[in-house]
Amino acid sequence: MYLSKFTDYNFRILIYLGNHPNEIFTVDELSSILGLSTNHIKKVIYKLAKNNYIYSSKGRNGGVKLIMNPKDINLEALLEITEDNLNIVEYFSSDIISCNLNGECKLKPALNDALNSFKLKLSEYTLADII
C-alpha cells in the first residue's frame, strides 16, 4: 500500500502543530521547518481548516494553529479525508467490476481484508499517540 504525499504532509503538519500547541505558524515558517513547498502547505492547510482540525487566518498577522485536541484527532479519520484512493489494486475501483480470472481470483477479498485491518488498526491511534 502506498499513501500519497498529501497524506504524509497532513500527518507531518499535524504532528508539528501538535508538538507546539497554542503557537501560530505562517506558511513560510512551516515550509522552512518541514522542508515542504509553500504550495503543498497551502493545500494541506485548506483541507485541515475545512475539516476543523486547525485554525487558519490570512494576512499580516495570519497563520495556522491546531484547534482540535490531539486526543480527538483519529488517524484513520484523517486518512479518510486525505486519501482519495485507497484501492490496493486497480480492480478495486468501482469502474472495474471484477478480475479477469472470472471467479477464480480470491485476491480481491484477501486484499480488502488487509486494507480493512490496516484501517481498523489505524483507528486505534490518535494524534496524541504520535506526538
Residue ranges, per PLM feature:
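Short alpha-helical segments that sit at the start of domains
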Residues: 1-13
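A short alpha-helical element within helix-turn-helix/winged-helix DNA-binding domains
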Residues: 28-34
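Key DNA-contact positions within bacterial/archaeal DNA-binding proteins
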Residues: 39
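Glycine-centered, phosphate/nucleic-acid-interacting loop/turn motifs that mediate DNA/RNA or nucleotide
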Residues: 52
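Non-DNA-binding regulatory cores of transcription-related proteins
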Residues: 67-131
